[in-house]
């Protein structure tokens, strides 16, 4: 089988504990898809895969993307990654995430609408 990790929602330090969501599960995916966190609102995406999978595209099948390799988008993605690291946004995501989780747990005990 093939393991695919879709990092569109959880990638780029958003889970706090690790930079990529799959790292929290101690797996190494065959394919990783990255989108929204990479461009912080600017349209960009990426697919990262193991060498064997990439080589399977060398059989003559062509892939075309209108905006593929756009230098502006690539520059923005690089700056987003640098900003996340420089401003320690992954650490902040962990702090805010823990706070939010704890507040939801408190709410669950006060309001009988949430079942834990």
Residue spans for each PLM region:
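Conserved N-terminal phosphate-binding loop of PLP-dependent enzymes in the Aspartate aminotransferase
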Residues: 1-116
């Amino acid at each position: 089988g093939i393991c695919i990790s879709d990092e569109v929602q959880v990638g780029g330090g958003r889970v706090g504990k690790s930079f990529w969501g799959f790292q929290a599960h101690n797996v190494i995916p065959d394919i990783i898809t990255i989108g929204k966190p990479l461009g912080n609102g600017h349209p960009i995406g990426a697919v990262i895969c193991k060498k064997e999978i990439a080589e399977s595209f060398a059989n003559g099948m062509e892939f075309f993307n209108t905006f593929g390799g756009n230098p502006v988008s690539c520059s923005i993605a690089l700056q987003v990654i640098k900003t996340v690291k420089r401003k320690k946004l992954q650490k902040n995501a962990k702090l805010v995430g823990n706070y939010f989780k704890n507040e939801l747990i408190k709410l669950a005990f006060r309001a009988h609408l949430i079942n834990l």
